[in-house]
């Protein structure tokens, strides 16, 4: 799975990437790739990813994100609590749900 996290460019999303990578390794999730990018990068890079999740700090851009990726692309918002505590299990569950797994 290739998961793109969209944020405002803060350090917290980089920490979340590390938690997701650690969770993937501990649970035998192979071929996992995750990166964090700012919202303005989305139009140029989203097609290279399986799923795009955005943090609560950029949820005001949700309409822009949906318009950018189109109606059928797997796109979702990470819940504020899951984002704040780095709940990798719930974030993976969200990604899998969006991917139809």
Residue ranges and their predicted role:
Residues 2-40:
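Conserved active-site segments centered on acidic
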Residues 13, 17, 62, 88-91:
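A general structural signal for well-ordered alpha-helical segments in protein cores
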Residues 24, 32, 44-49, 54-74, ...:
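Cofactor-cradling patches in redox/metallo enzymes
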Residues 42, 65, 91-95:
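Generic hydrophobic alpha-helical segments
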Residues 74-101:
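Ser/Thr/Gly-rich flexible loops in soluble cytosolic domains mediating phosphotransfer, phosphorylation
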């Amino acid at each position: 799975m290739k998961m793109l996290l969209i944020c405002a460019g803060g350090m917290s999303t980089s920490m979340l990437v590390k938690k997701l990578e650690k969770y993937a390794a501990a649970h035998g999730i192979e071929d996992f790739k995750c990166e964090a990018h700012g919202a303005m990068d989305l139009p140029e890079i989203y097609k290279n990813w399986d799923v795009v999740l955005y943090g609560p700090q950029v949820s005001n851009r949700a309409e822009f994100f949906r318009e950018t990726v189109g109606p059928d692309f797997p796109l979702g918002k990470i819940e504020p609590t899951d984002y704040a505590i780095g709940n990798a299990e719930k974030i993976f569950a969200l990604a899998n749900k969006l991917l139809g797994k």
